[in-house]
Each structure stands twice: as structure tokens, then as C-alpha cells.
């Protein structure tokens, strides 16, 4: 299994956003732009509307691999936390949290309970 940690950078004001995805970072960037067009109120999406899509670029920070989905999600969350801190993107960018909440999936125990 594979996931990615990416950064979206606004070169109009030098503010970053760090995220994680299992669908590919370019596809995820497109989804952020679509959400901005739909009027999403997230800070990054408001900024895309304010400055225009052409002021933003995306880059891959890391590719993460794992044997299981749970292991991948744990690694992605850990790396997202690391990069948000390293790039100071919570305080000086568009991240609203310290990271590690993305791609939440029910645990195997929860899946059993709800099935």
C-alpha cells in the first residue's frame, strides 16, 4: 500500500498547507481546487478563491509505503504531523490542526461492531 505527504504552497504570500492522501497528490490538489470553487470555508479553500488557483502549486514531500492499511494510516499521520511542524504550516500557513487526523477509518473492532 502507498500514500503520500504533499505541500500546497501559495507563492503570493509564502503560506504552505501540508496534507496526506492515498489517491495521489495531484488528484488531491484538484479536489482542493474543486472544493474552493464550491465555496468550502476551509482556510486553504478561501485562499484559493482569494488569490486564484494560479498562485498555488503542489509538490510531493514523501511517499509512504506499508504492508497494511492500518500501518499506512499510522505512518501517514506521523509524517503529516512531522511536516506540519517542520514547515510551521499550522501557525504560518493554512493547516488548522497539528495533523494526524486525516484519512480516519474505523478500527477493525469498530468495523465488527457496526457490521
Label the predicted regions.
Residues 1-113:
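Structure-specific nucleic-acid interaction/processing domains
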Amino acid at each position: 500500500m502507498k500514500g503520500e505527504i504533499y505541500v500546497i504552497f501559495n507563492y503570493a504570500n509564502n503560506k504552505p498547507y501540508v496534507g496526506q492522501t492515498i489517491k495521489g497528490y495531484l488528484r488531491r490538489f484538484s479536489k482542493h481546487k474543486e472544493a474552493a470553487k464550491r465555496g468550502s470555508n476551509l482556510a486553504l479553500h478561501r485562499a484559493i478563491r482569494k488569490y486564484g488557483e494560479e498562485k498555488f502549486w503542489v509538490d510531493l514531500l514523501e511517499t509512504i509505503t506499508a504492508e497494511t492499511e492500518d500501518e499506512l494510516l499510522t505512518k501517514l499521520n506521523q509524517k503529516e504531523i512531522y511536516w506540519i511542524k517542520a514547515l510551521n504550516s499550522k501557525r504560518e500557513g493554512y493547516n488548522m490542526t497539528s495533523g494526524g487526523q486525516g484519512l480516519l477509518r474505523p478500527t477493525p473492532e469498530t468495523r465488527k461492531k457496526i457490521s
